[in-house]
Amino acid sequence: QRQRCIRDRLVAVILSAQCTDKRVNMTTPALFEAYPTPEAMAQATAEEIYAYIKSISYPNNKARNLAAMARMLCTEFGGVVPSDLDALQRLPGVGRKTANVVGAVIWGKEVMPVDTHVFRVSARIGLTRGAKTPLQTELQLEKNIPSHLLPVAHHWLILHGRYVCTARAPKCDACGIA
């Protein structure tokens, strides 16, 4: 049961790239019902998976990645999502940010996933200086935020970016940080 939860979170994070959580949460129940295990998903074609995720952004690429990821989970990891971040990044569709999200959320690893909100907010409020890439941002944040707070600080920065420090019309007058 725990492995299913971990696999479901990994799939949801893969699907969330350039997509809203709301859309992902609307899409995943049917996907997980159709493919309740990595073994079941590994037997599916990308076209079959596409039918369940077509309302998600970039569904063709994500369907191919999910099928290949499930096959690799089964062949190389015994159907178990690896906890090692480097091993996670070997899976199709899993880059540094996705691996860091899974590491922080599932295993409480002291890492800082950097999405567009984290990148923007950390620069605006001065947690980073001159960072031009997500990796530079991640490394600066890991120096500037106590390590035990990194897994939750990621969520704080995302929420602040979604609701206060928005990209187009930041609510600086409502910001308790600025």
Question: Across the structure, where does each feature detected by a protein language model lie?
Answer:
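Catalytic cores of DNA base-excision repair glycosylases
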Residues: Q1-Q3, R7-A178
